[in-house]
Each structure stands twice: as structure tokens, then as C-alpha cells.
Amino acid sequence: MFELRGAPALSPFRREKLLKNIQEQAPEVQSVYAEYMHFVDLEGDLSAEQRTVLDRLLQYGPQGQSEMPSGTLFLVVPRPGTISPWSSKATDIAHNCGLTAIRRIERGVAYHVGSSEQLSSERRAAIAAILHDRMTQSVFHEIAGAELLFAHAEPKPMTTVDILADGRDALAEANRSMGLALAEDEIDYLTSAFTELGRNPTDVELMMFAQANSEHCRHKIFNATWEIDGEVQSHSLFGMIRNTYEQGGQDVLSAYCDNAAVIKGGQGGRFFPDHRTKIYGYNVEDIHILMKVETHNHPTAISPFAGASTGSGGEIRDEGATGIGAKPKAGLTGFTVSNLNIPGYKQPWEGDYGKPERIVSALQIMLDGPIGGAAFNNEFGRPALCGYFRTYEEQVPGVNGLEWRGYHKPIMIAGGMGNIRASHVEKKDISVDAKLIVLGGPAMLIGLGGGAASSMDSGAGQEDLDFASVQRDNPEMERRCQEVIDRCWQLGDDNPILFIHDVGAGGLSNALPELVKDGGRGGLFELRDVPNDEPGMSPLEIWCNESQERYVMAVAEQDMELFDQLCRRERCPYAVVGSATEELKIQVSDEYFANSPVDLPMSVLFGKPPKMHRTIERKSFTKPIFDSTTLDLKEAAERILRLPSVASKSFLITIGDRSVTGMVSRDQMVGPWQAPVSDVAVTTASFDTYRGEAMAMGERTPIALIDPPSSGRMAVGEAITNLAAAKIEKLSDIKLSANWMAAAGHPGEDEALFETVKAVGMELCPELGITIPVGKDSMSMKTVWEEGEKQKSVTAPLSLIISGFAPVEDVRKTLTPQMDLSTPSKLLLIDLGSGKNRLGGSALAQVYRSVGAVAPDLDNPEELAAFFACIQKLNNEGKLKAYHDRSDGGVFTTLCEMAFASRCGMTICFDGLVKDRTHIARELFNEELGAVVQVSEEHVDEVKTCFADAGLADHVVVLGEPHADQSVKFQHEGQTVLGYSRGALQKIWAETSYRMQSMRDNSECAAEEFAAIDDDNDPGLSAKLTYDVNEDIAAPFINRGAKPKIVVLREQGVNSQAEMAAAFDRAGFSAVDVHMSDILSGAVSLSQFKALAACGGFSFGDVLGAGEGWAKSILFNARARDQFEAFFHRKDTFALGVCNGCQMISNLKELIPGADAWPRFVRNRSEQYEARVAMVEVLDSPSILLQGMAGSMMPIAVAHGEGLAEVGPEGAAALMAQKNVALRFVDNYGRPTMSHPFNPNGSPLGITSVCNDDGRITVMMPHPERVFRAVANSWRPSAWSEDGAWMRMFRNARVWLG
């Protein structure tokens, strides 16, 4: 082994934050410096030339300090005995560069901690705990410790539990020590089963049974029988959910039997490459919609980043593994936590009840968890388009007396939708001898016992077991797996997949038995064929670990050659680990130890111990009245705007890519000022249609503290009023996912759960004609701990989170909260609460530390159905200019958010609504269902008539009107009872987000964004074009029939190739899918092409720098280098690099004539991934792609973490002077800017695209290919029809080729 120092691992900003963290534990620490250390394991010597290549490979990131840093060394490295995902990718890159003498490269971080006195062993331990993740990393105080990275561990043997000698007691002890979470009747069942088999169980079999039969996996409570007040109930909880399908399952193609539900979609052209020719094309067919929503609550409480990240990853795998292979498309995320208690910003309703040591604080969850969820989606390439965020923690009355209710065990929701072919919805039969395959990453000792651990109340397990049950993520690997699945489903009837499942809770021990059971077979497996990056693991650890990014599948023997080709091209690892058998038995042999860790009849593993039976008695309690009549309106309004469920969610949104796929039509950000106020997400079905899909969420959990069934009805109602903004043909087109969280067994909670499921499943949804074809439950929502002598607990309210999905008729007709001030208009409230104005469970009650006695409710489902039909009709007729539903914070919040989205003011009059001023608070802040619509004055009567004809005449109230003057006034009897400037109101609403952003990211950037809210004159996004957006300058060339081929180039981890291909296809090119493996193998030569586009994503997961690993595998591979150099030097070629492709090509500048002065692109100034819509100016440059566009200013999608052009002031000025700069960021006034977020990455002079001297090679960080359609722009001028402004760039390319 030898080591090589690398770049600084932390920016000055991150270093300062870390120092403050460490000083809380060790005040004597004065400095900290961190740099990467690389460790290289060789099986032969490197030549001098190879050593140079290695040195250059490991030079990435910012410049480090040359002298050795001083201070105590904390060397953080991957846990010895494991191979990190970073190592696998870096070693692959090294091998691609011809460095085959390298066995492995591994990376650690050397932290040098300077202190005023020698650190004690206790202090060292405390600092080490801050610096590393003990699940996946180790800490050494000497470099030599890293030698252990390459040591070879001997496998550990299995053990058995001696029940033949010690009986049931032996199993009960194993249950406790192994954290199996077996119920008493399950212990009896297993004791009996193995006694009958005449042998002792192995530890592997016990863990496998525990995972397969955990509450997490088998949903025992939802399948239980119930007795209430002595009366046996006729339905289980699951039976009541299924009732919605039995009553109205039309257009549901798959429910309750697969990883996700499938519902009917519309027709369109699915755009993908032909397997044989690799040319992209449209395949017109039914594009059905799949829907899934998961929770990952337990892991997120323990380790928020990893918990949320793997939660998203697991849900994405569920979608991909639907039917016999499907395509995930768009994601949603939600969080519910206890009070944030932001330092220096503590709110009047926030107390400090404490928490157990083993879980992190609500604040830490919300600083780290959302980044984890967003990072996985970003790297995988799935846009995150909607969600929710709620905090709740309060001492309230219940059947148990006064007790603390809240979310110390958080809710982390990961969900989404995708598409699937009609012929792939049903899984196929598994043939005897079919190959059983693990696709994806290797086994590692992470996430052990996650299914069982998440089934226990938080605090009931041992802390080490808690931590061991959290998985770790590798999204780039999952992307590779999905590419293989994509290649399979794109083959249509020749799809080689017979059956597929994702690997989740319980690891292979759950996934493989489930695969063969569902396929009607048994399975014979060889343990040592499981890919394993941790050779020292025991059989239990190999079989049961929850390493992520894995799928299991069955492939017929005759299709293995095809499947192998697909995997090799995508560089996706797979292994045949067994074969399907006629005998219904699971047998796992272990050739290393020559034994069988598992040898069980399927009937034992899946045979059920007695079904759970739950007996409850109804109880009641006195609910104190919440009196709002004496409240100060101004104080109440400001408190509500600061409550996280109401406040701006910007800090949760801009971290997530919302443009990838090029099919996003409506994300959270609305209008020219990109206000985070949309409650519905809308995507197009493909690039050739206006049909699409919509999704939205609904949840009103605090209501459950006083009226659980109401909370369920209100959650469903909110999802519907959110979805109503999209153009959906009929209410029954909406299908719901229901995620149920409860503290089962806690007094009153079983009754709350049963009654709410009944209200939703047996009553409300059947009345509305709506089906719930998918869902999830988490039944252990209670945290218990000891503080001194005191026993403490925090119990979550019953929590139903609804996610609604529907096909959309026309994505162009999605309504938003942005108002149109071009003609006089009125704002109308449609009040589905019938003037009852109930305040129980409201934001108003919460900010005054109350919960109230009477909750809002959906009293009349027929009225909700009529409301939905009216909104759809009026939208179709063009009578509605804006729409926003009423929810958290009441109509006050609804109106404020409409003003923020429109950068305008409004005058609202309550004269017709309240006679007595003391009732204004109830009118303003009640959270009854409803919506506010903006209607032109000329259409007000027609709109009222429409609602009257639907029986809703008494529910429509004219509230007032919007106006350009930015004052927001609420008036009663001629007096302003509440008045603000729009800017002042918006800053109150945005401050919670700003504070979180300041703590998490570069605080200077957060402050600049916050300050920009004040600018009343900010014109917002605009499009000032020097060309006609609707002119097709490529038409004459397309009409000749010639379609020049363009290489749409990708590397492993790239995720934006489809939209790039679609844009060039529309411009008259024949887009060819080319993987770097095609070039390196010699299967494809660039000499055959005149055009190349390098796409965005995360090649190699950004290992060795963003785009740098990809570039170096070209620079240091003779075949690839020669091809790229020749291509760049030919005068008849052009190339475009976008985002990751830009980062890659900029690192190839030594091969490109006239690119000497190009910058590299490094970490954003904000220190955060930035997903924005930014204004750019097209500069006068020789870029052949931007000819005729100079002087134009228009919006463009931005989504990257490393886009800052690394060039000094002189270098930047020189690039400008030489006309090598093609695009630069400008603010909304059209001025070049350094200010955040108008310059999202902080590049000097706003530089975000450069070209070479002759203009043939252009690279840019923003994404024109994602917004080539007008409908794919988050905001667009109304004059645009089909084409967006950036389509001209692709047509310029076609014109240049002639």
C-alpha cells in the first residue's frame, strides 16, 4: 500500500461549521483542517508513466495546501473489511485508464485538529464520534492504520439455537439478544415447527423468519381481527381499504399484489432507443401510471441523511420492480417532526421536553434528512415535485390524561409515480430451473434487522441494534440497475425478466424467498455466489443485510445471454445466486463451510402463527374549548406564517432537481418570482403529447388528537382540493395511496386507527368513487426513554398521509396561485365548511399551544364532488385565472401565498362574512376545506351560477380583489383590521426557511436570497428574444428527409440522455444512444459521426470530481483519447456538453483546439445543490449553437452542485474579451450578477457557458434540453405555443450541418 494526499475535503465555510460543532464537545480545540487521503493497493509495480496517470487521476477538487498540516490526526476511512462504493468506482476508472496493476484504490479523510492542550482520550472519542459514521467508517490516529483497509478477513461461521435441549427459553433469549421482535405466539410457532423438523434452527433461519414476518413486512395489525366494546367487527383494516377497490376499482390495473399499484394512463409516444440500432424513436402506446408511497421513519430518526436517502432509493426500486419492469418518473417527499427549536429563533409554542440520546433532534432531521432524500433523487435522475412538512409537539389531553404528543419518531415519506407498458403490468410464471439473480451492488454489513427494528417502539431495542438497522446509499448504482431494467422493458415482448422484486427490509432473506413464493416455486441458492464486499461476514450477515441498490429477479436460462449483454453494456454487476425448483422449499448452501444455513419448507417460513386479534373499548375525554375571540390578529397572523407547516418550504425545494426528464410541467415553484406555493405536481406522459400525470398530498394529523375520523376525511379532502388545480376528467380518475402511522397499543390509538380506516375505506372513498389501491402502515410511532429517574414518552397522533395520483387530460390547463392583473378581477372563496369555521387542530390553535375541541370535517362528500366538477368545468372554459386551496393557516395563508406568487397586493373585505369583529380570527384562520379562485369581473356571475347549479350557491363568497399596489389589507366595516406590505408579509413567511438555509448552506447566499424579497420593483423572470420562438429554421433541412446522426453520449450515472435525444430528434437529427462502454470496447467509433452531445447526471457518482472521472477515463485510455481528439479537431463536427457533460468536456480541453482558457467547474458558492430557474443572457460568441440568439435573455433550468467556473478575475475578463463566453447569468433586470440565487453557482461575471475559438464545441452548466418544449418551463410567456425558447439552439445545430 502507498498513500497520496488529495484536495481539501471541506470548504472554509464547512470547516468553520465543523469547528463550532467540535468546540461544543471540546472547547480547547482551536482549528480543524481536512483533506482527502488516497490509499492504493497494488498487485504489481507501476511504471513511471502509469504513476503519472495515477497522480493526475487523484488530482481533483480545489487546490490543497502543500505543507503537512499540524494537529492531532483523525483519519476517517471506510470500515476495514469493507469496500466502499467510492472505491469500486475509482478502481473501475483506474482500470479503464489502463492501470490494471492497481488492485484497489480507497479514500479517507485526514482531519487535523489543533488544540490549546493535549486532547484526553475522552475528548478524542467525542471528536471521533462527530467525524465519522460508525456504521460504515473507522477512525485511526496514524496513517499506518489504513493498512487494515486491505487486510483479508476470514468468514465467520453460522450458529444454531439449541431448542431441542433448552426448548422455548433458548428461542426467547435469541429473540432478545438478536433483536428479532418476535411475538410470543411466533416463538411458540417456531419452537413447535423446529421440534417437528427434529433439528435446531440456525441463526440465519431465525433472522430470516423475523424479517419475513415482521410487522414492517407482513402488516399484522392491518390483517388482524377486531373486537370493539364486545362486538366482533366484520372487516379487518386491510379489508376496509380493499373495499374501496371492490366498490370502485375501474381503471386500476394492479392493486395490493405488487411493489406498486398501476392505474390507467393515456396514449402517447414513449421515447427510447431501439435495441438493435440504438436510434431513439417514438413508440405510440398506452402509457400506464404506477404509484407508490413508502415511509422510512425509524432510520430517519437514527441517521437522517442515510435514512431519508435510502427511503427514497427503496421507493424508487419498488417502482422499477413493478410488473416485469417499469420506469420511475417523479417523486414526492414529506416530513413530520417535533418542534424545531431553531437556535436564536425559538417560537412561543415551542417547549423543550427533551429526547433520548439515540435519536437526533427534529432540527437535525430537517437539516440532514431532506438533503439525503433530495441527493438520492438528484443522482438517480428523478425530479422531486411535491411534498409537505409539518412540526408538532405538545402536551394535550387524551384518554390517557395530559400527555406529550409529537413526532420524536418522525414521519419520512418517500413516494412517486412512474410509467409501465400495458403488457408488463402482470408478472410472469417462474419456470423450473429459471436463474435467480441479484442485480446491483454487493452485500455489506449495513442495515441488519431493519424490518424488525422499525416494527418496535423507538426505545424498545438496544441502541447498537437501532444504529445497525440503518442502511447506506449508492444512487449511481441504482441508476445503473434501472438502465438495465429500462433496456429490458424497452424490448417489449422480448423482455427477459419473468419476475422482479426490489431488495428492501430483510435483505435477500426476504426478497429471494418472496420472489420464488410469489412465482409459485421453491429456490436452491449458493450463499457464496452473492456479491460480497465484506468477506468476513457470517452467513446471517450475508443473507440478511439490507445493502441497498439491489433487485432480485428470475430470468429463463435461454435469455441469460441477452441479459448478460445488457448488464455488461451498462456496467451493472449481477450474479446468478440460485435456481427455481419444483419443490416448495428454501435451501441455501454454503460451499465455504460445506453446510446449509437455511433448509426450510416454504410452509414454515410463510406459514402463519395464529392471526392477531385486537380487543378495544371505546373511551372518551373532555376537550377544552379554544377561544379565538380575544386574540391579537397581528400576532396570530405572524405566528402562523412562521409555523413550519405554513411557512415557505423553499429550503426543502431548491435542493431537489425539478427539471430532469424534460417532462416536468408543474413543480412547486410558481410564476416569474418562483414562489414555492404550488400544491400539485404535473408531468407530461412523453415529449409528443399534452396528456400527463398529476400527484398531490393531503394530511391533517393534529386533528386526530380530537377527532381521528375527521383527520382522515380531511386528508383525503385536501389531496382532492390540491389535485383540482390540474385538468382531470373526473373525480374517480383520482387514485389514492394511504400511509397510516399509529402508536398501536397506546391507550385510545387502536380505536382511533380503526375508526379512521372505517371512515375512509367504508364510507368516504366509496361515496366519492375513489379507490385506494396502495399504501403502507407503520404501527410503532412512540418514543420512550428514561431521564434520570423519570420515564418519558412522546407519542405521535394517529397520522394518515394521503397521496393522490391521476391521469391529466391537458397539462397546459393546470391552474396555479399566480394571479393575472391584466384585467379587473375578483377573488372568490368556495367554502366547503359551510361557514362553520371550526378551529380544532388548526395552525392557530397550535401556535397558542392548544388543540381545540371541534375539528373541521368533510361533512358532505357530495359537495366535495360537486366542487371538483365545477372547478374542472370552469377551468376547461377558461373562466378561472388562478386557483389555490385552503389548508394550513386558513384563507389568510391562501391569499398571502397568491400575493407572493404574483408580487402584488390585495384588498379583502369581511363585511359579508362576519358581523362581529371578534369572529374575524375564525374566518381568517379556520382550515375547513375549500379554495380561492381569481375570476375576471366579467365572469363572476357565470362562475357563481356554475356553483349554484351544483348546489353550492351558499358556499361562494366574493372576498375582494388583487391589485398592483403591493399592500395586503384585510378590512371590516371600512377599517383595515390587518395590513402589511407584500414584502413584509413574505419575509415573515420566508424567515423559517431562511434560518434553516443559513444553518445548512452558505449563510451569505441565504441572506442575499432573503433580502431580494423586499424588492417590489423586481420584474421577475422574462423572455426578451432576438428571434421568433415559433419559427422552425430547421424545417427546410428536415423536409429533405436527411437525418444526420448525433451521438447522445452517456457514462454510468448519467441520467439526462432521453431529453437530450428528444430535443435533437425534434430538430431533425437521428439521435443515437452511445454508452462510453461502446467506445472503450471499440463497438462504436466517433469517426462515423459529425455531432456529439454529452449529457447531464452524475457520472461515476462524481467520484474523482464532477465529470472528472469520466474525462480521465477518456484522457488516459488510448483508444478513447484518440477518438475524441480526432473528433474535436475535425472541422465538420460540433459538440455540446451540458451539466455533467460540461464538466467532463471542460476537463478534456487539452484535446480541444481553441479551448486553452476554459475553466473547470467546481462546488457552488452556496455549498449546496441548486435547482433553480435562472435568467441567462446569450452573448455574442462564435458558438454555432447560439447563432442569431445573441442579446436574448430568457429563463433556463439549472440543476447542479458543482457549477462555479473556477477562473480568477483576470481569466474571466480574458474569456469575455476573447468572446469565449456564450451564456452568463443575469438578474431579473437583465444585469450580469454575482448575487444568489440569480447566479445560482456564484461563477465570476455570471459565466455559465463557454465555447472554443471556432464555436464548434460549446459547454454549459444549465439545461436547455429540459425546457425545449414550452410546457416544460416552470414559467413561460403566454405567447409561447409548443416550442420553448431553447429549441432554437438545437435547430441551429441542424442548420449548421446543412
UniProtKB/Swiss-Prot annotation:
Primary localisation category: cytoplasm
Top-level division of the source organism's lineage: Bacteria
Binding site for ATP: 307-318, 887
E.C. numbers: 6.3.5.3
Localization, UniProt: Cytoplasm
Keywords: ATP-binding, Cytoplasm, Glutamine amidotransferase, Ligase, Magnesium, Metal-binding, Nucleotide-binding, Purine biosynthesis
CDD domains: GATase1_FGAR_AT, PurL_repeat1, PurL_repeat2
Positions of the Glutamine amidotransferase type-1 domain: 1046-1298
Pathway(s) this gene product operates in, as recorded in its UniProt entry: Purine metabolism; IMP biosynthesis via de novo pathway; 5-amino-1-(5-phospho-D-ribosyl)imidazole from N(2)-formyl-N(1)-(5-phospho-D-ribosyl)glycinamide: step 1/2
InterPro entries noted in UniProt: Class_I_gatase-like (IPR029062), FGAR-AT_N (IPR040707), FGAR-AT_PurM_N-like (IPR055181), PurL_large (IPR010073), PurL_linker (IPR041609), PurM-like_C_dom (IPR010918), PurM-like_C_sf (IPR036676), PurM-like_N_sf (IPR036921)
GO biological process, one term: 'de novo' IMP biosynthetic process
PROSITE patterns in alphabetical order: GATASE_TYPE_1
Catalytic site positions: 1139, 1263, 1265
Keyword Secreted: no
Subunit structure: Monomer.
Annotated NCBIfam families: FGAM_synt, PRK05297.1
Functional description taken from the UniProt entry: Phosphoribosylformylglycinamidine synthase involved in the purines biosynthetic pathway. Catalyzes the ATP-dependent conversion of formylglycinamide ribonucleotide (FGAR) and glutamine to yield formylglycinamidine ribonucleotide (FGAM) and glutamate.
Listed name of the protein: Phosphoribosylformylglycinamidine synthase
Species: Hahella chejuensis (strain KCTC 2396)
